[in-house]
């Protein structure tokens, strides 16, 4: 039986990964979260990983609060950069594969067409900078790695979909940014891609998002449509949002990722974002 360590097991992706593997007797999932394993401590990581001797490590742990990363820079770099470095060192030492989840925020967000894996990152926020450093550490310390950049993730837990549905219960209308464009991605779809990659030797950096694109306001509109809500969506600009929340971190205006490498290695495709969102509501 192949053992797989999943960090951040209680998050959206961690839960989706567990569901993806739950009926496969070939794998044993070893779940960890911050209470069980502090990935920022190299001694604890090495001790844990060496004791388990896993086939693979799937790192779903991250500090994802974009505004929080601006305020707690040290914490952001510890979790998003030092943590992945420690896991990479441990994976290399034990011969394990490492799946590391990254983000569209490693790019500046000023492109006119989807970013491929061959475009050079240039993050503008502390969240993006810390995640980019994490990627570099993974590549430096672990040969058998899969770095998967994703975006606008939703699943079980706190996310944009749940936030919109909660607001719909309290308010007749909501204001949502219309000039930030990306690809909403279900944790279930991302977990399926991880499952596809992990048993291969196609190591490297990948983009993993649902197909097609929309604005946050379009996303909210589709959420309310599928939920049967009459909540009105007011389309506002990023400048409007910045005036409303002056201390918020800068967000990418265009962070659409092209899953180019997945197509190159075998034609794997994600569902389009509307189909995946519809399945989420079923």
Give residue spans per PLM region.
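N-terminal Rossmann NAD(P)H-binding glycine-rich loop of SDR-like oxidoreductase domains
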Residues: 3-22
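Conserved C-terminal active-site "lid" loop/helix of NAD(P)H-dependent oxidoreductases
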Residues: 215-221, 240-281
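NAD(P)H-binding glycine-rich loop region in Rossmannoid oxidoreductase-like domains
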Residues: 42-79
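Catalytic helix-loop patch of NAD(P)-dependent Rossmann-fold dehydrogenases
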Residues: 78, 83-86, 93, 106-148, ...
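Adenosine-cofactor binding site in Rossmann-like domains, unifying the SAM/SAH pocket
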Residues: 28-47
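SDR active-site strand-loop-helix element
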Residues: 7, 32, 57-61, 98-103, ...
């Amino acid at each position: 039986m192949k053992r797989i360590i999943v960090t951040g097991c209680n998050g959206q992706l961690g839960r989706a990964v567990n569901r993806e593997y739950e009926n496969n007797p070939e794998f044993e999932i070893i779940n960890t979260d911050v209470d069980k394993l502090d990935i920022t401590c190299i001694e604890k990581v090495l001790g844990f990983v060496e004791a388990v001797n896993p086939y693979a490590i799937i790192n779903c742990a991250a500090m994802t609060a974009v505004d929080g990363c601006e305020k707690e820079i040290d914490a952001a770099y510890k979790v998003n950069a030092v943590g992945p470095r420690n896991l990479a060192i441990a994976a290399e030492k034990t011969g394990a594969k490492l799946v590391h989840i990254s983000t569209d925020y490693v790019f500046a967000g000023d492109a006119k067409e989807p970013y491929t894996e061959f475009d050079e990152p240039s993050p503008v926020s502390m969240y993006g900078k810390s995640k980019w450093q994490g990627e570099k550490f993974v590549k430096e310390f672990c040969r058998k790695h899969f770095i998967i950049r994703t975006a606008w993730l939703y699943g079980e837990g706190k996310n944009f979909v749940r936030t919109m549905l909660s607001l719909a219960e309290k308010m007749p209308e909501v204001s949502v940014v219309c000039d930030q464009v990306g690809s909403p991605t279900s944790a279930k779809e991302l977990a399926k891609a991880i499952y596809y990659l992990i048993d291969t030797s196609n190591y490297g950096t990948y983009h993993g998002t649902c197909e097609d694109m929309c604005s946050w306001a379009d996303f909210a509109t589709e959420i309310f449509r599928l939920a049967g809500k009459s909540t009105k969506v007011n389309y506002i600009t990023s400048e409007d949002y910045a005036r409303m929340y002056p201390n918020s971190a800068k967000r990418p205006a265009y962070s659409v990722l092209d899953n180019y490498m997945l197509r190159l290695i075998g034609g794997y495709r994600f569902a389009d974002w509307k189909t995946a969102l519809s399945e989420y509501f079923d």
